[in-house]
């Protein structure tokens, strides 16, 4: 038995489609609003916070490395997140209690590559781009 067809079936088709939409995972995620509540950024692209601690996270198999990360407490809601510090030796430019700007890393809501549970990356330290400090273009201000 297929879809009803013919005259006067529009209401039945429309109602059936409305009910079946809720079986679509992406539709549910967009319309329940729980994904926005669970997101530490609250729908924003970036968030600023204070560095709580510096840590190294072991890469997943088959890689063996210690990925340098920082724990950041966000200013907007007080949530603590783990953020990846890109480039070789950039962790040396970040101290505890520094202000950092954090952005998403890769796929929305998922960790990337071999770093388990890390969904964010550090973009700025003390309002200066981390890449600029790394390349020697700018110096980190001593505040």
UniProtKB/Swiss-Prot annotation:
TM region positions: none
A Pfam family recorded for this sequence: Ribosom_S12_S23
Positions bearing Hydroxyproline: 62
Keywords (A to Z) from UniProt: Hydroxylation, Ribonucleoprotein, Ribosomal protein
Leader sequence segment: none
Recorded GO CC terms: cytosolic small ribosomal subunit; ribosome
UniProt keyword Repeat, yes or no: no
GO molecular function per UniProt: structural constituent of ribosome
Record GO biological process: translation
Family designation: Belongs to the universal ribosomal protein uS12 family.
Protein name: Small ribosomal subunit protein uS12
Species in which this protein is naturally found: Dictyostelium discoideum (Social amoeba)
Gene it is expressed from: rps23
